[in-house]
Amino acid sequence: MKDNNNYNVLIVGNKGREYALAQRLQQDERVNALYFCLGNGGTQDLGENLECEHYEHIVELALKKQIHLAIISEEEFLVLGLTEMLEKAGILVFGASKEAAKLEASKSYMKAFVKECGIKSASYFETNDLKEALSYIQNASFPLVIKALNKNTSIVYQEEEAIKILEDAFKQSNEPVIIEPFLEGFELSVTALIANDDFILLPFCQNYKRLLEGDNGVNTGGMGAIAPANFFSNELEEKIKNHIFKPTLEKLQADNTPFKGVLLAEIVIIEEKGVLEPYLLDFSVRFKDIECQTILPLLESSLLDLCLATAKGELHSLELVFSKEFVMSVALVSRNYPTSSSPKQTLYIDPVDEKKGHLILGEVEQDNGVFESSGGRVIFAIGRGKSLLEARNHAYEIAQKVHFEGMFYRKDIGFKVLDLKEYS
């Protein structure tokens, strides 16, 4: 569907995924200009970072800069209805509608939605009363998963740990808390392009969320990832399509909920009576760190065409081609991630062999060519290779090109599928 038009593109967000999207879009000669709200220290070298005071201001800036396509990857702005506001202003938008964004923004809404669809997911107990929650865990079997404050997901192994998490959650908010049994299995992140009743699956990804080697420590947004995670039969992929994505889109359509963007399903594969079954853990309604920067290097087709076809609701016109290579991403994080903020640190970056991979700048600031850390997941080392082992070796070689005080990264990304005996 390639056209010869020129496009001014606005990307809403300020993390590694926005840098990854921009880095790829910049390679398309039809992209006339890139703008970011707010962007980060890396994106300012790829386009123009705009000062955005509030979400209504973004619409004003988009009109001023004559934006043709907006890509929204910040949940907050999707929930506030930025998609609808930009579309009303005549701008194409790659992003979920306000109503669809509730699938990520509200754990309570998502669980009720999934139950109504008949999608396999963990059983759950929901309450906005601390006493009820404490009473429930007294009789529950551990480990448990506690989803609180609509963002924090904790895997807990002891009652004392659960009590502390629940008490802290109810001190901060009256939002309902979800308590589920922990589902043991092989986890996958499955990203789909959604255009209302149509969808296309992108390569499967495996996100290593726990902070420490061997999948220990607290949950994070992702310490590393591999793609494609194609270790399963076509039959399992069909189950994921037919038992998770199709029922979801059918209900969205029945509820008159528009959706033109990305839907990411976090799935756990469980063996039941000798048969592999996908269970849904969570939904996200946008590109996610770290999946985005792991999948994009596999895309040989135009990212601009992908976004345009999705935003126009014309996925049928899209022909996607993916590389046969493997990709591994490793998050280089600041000392106190993810529990608290860390002091800013100056980054020192050595040259990278781009035949082996590249770096994605995440939570960084830049002043006169000097980069500083500004958050938890600072930089992502991306390795490519003809095998997963080669991609792994390249990712860790690239990770060693970055230096800042307190830098930490997991050294076992891929251990679940590679023969890394010291971590298994």
Curated annotation (Swiss-Prot):
Its EC number is 6.3.4.13. GO terms for molecular function: ATP binding; metal ion binding; phosphoribosylamine-glycine ligase activity. Pfam families: GARS_A, GARS_C, GARS_N. Keywords: ATP-binding, Ligase, Nucleotide-binding, Purine biosynthesis. One of its GO terms (biological process) is 'de novo' IMP biosynthetic process. It catalyses: 5-phospho-beta-D-ribosylamine + glycine + ATP = N(1)-(5-phospho-beta-D-ribosyl)glycinamide + ADP + phosphate + H(+). It is an enzyme of class 6 (ligase). NCBIfam families: purD. Belongs to the GARS family. This is Phosphoribosylamine--glycine ligase. The lineage of its organism: Bacteria, Pseudomonadati, Campylobacterota, Epsilonproteobacteria, Campylobacterales.
